[in-house]
């Protein structure tokens, strides 16, 4: 009987959390002219937050942007003066293009607002934050709001780009991979890996901060409280150490042992090494999804060395398969806006010291 009593006062809690990756689903909502994008119409915001949370994704996106800007952007003489200040915010054309590249690498698309006069002469160009853009089913309208998902949120409505209308509009670019209304980011196949890398970082942070991140037994040796108190204590411990902040723990409520609370760590099962191996494979998966080599972004996770020739060959391949296609997209976009080719990227000059 006593044995059964002891067992009844031992509580196990597996506090591992399965993280749900948002789906990039498109949906027509009754009463709304635009098509929603993801749960609560906030999938682009999820991608943006993923970029902010992941040092690896930031490094890749920012590096791709720098590579894509090249050594210089040559402008046609016809737009030289305009390029020095493309809007009332005082932005230069290069500023606008850099923002566009960032959006292309995070979201897979971009949007540019065009301001014209009554004779359809171009007056200003503005970058529109792509995470705030939605479109209607026939792609004739662009809707812009900073508060998608909030009750009662409103959106500014723009016409989709049409050079013959003689009024301002928005050039909406959704890339080449999508078969629907919204773009697909290049790294879509690596999103789970990016999430995993952020959880690994959190695990190590909490390992250092809390020194409490492996399977643990917690003995409360100052009496056995009733079930309500036990449940409350379990919730408090789970709230303190959850997700990647801890693993499975066990609470034991005992009548004595000098009224002390004792913490016993079980064998850690080489968890640090498992995380290290997981991080290595995760990193590889992220870079594969971006068709990139870690060394091009200052990383060489396996410490295998990387010769100058290998580096140059890797950059040449990456430049041909990722950077140049994105540069050509931007050149075509501005050809649309001005009616003729007006910009040309001078390739990034990669200098590698022996």
Protein language model regions, located:
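Structured, contiguous alpha/beta core segments that scaffold functional sites
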Residues: 1-255
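A contiguous, surface-oriented mixed alpha/beta subdomain in the mid-to-C-terminal portion of proteins
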Residues: 176-333, 342-351
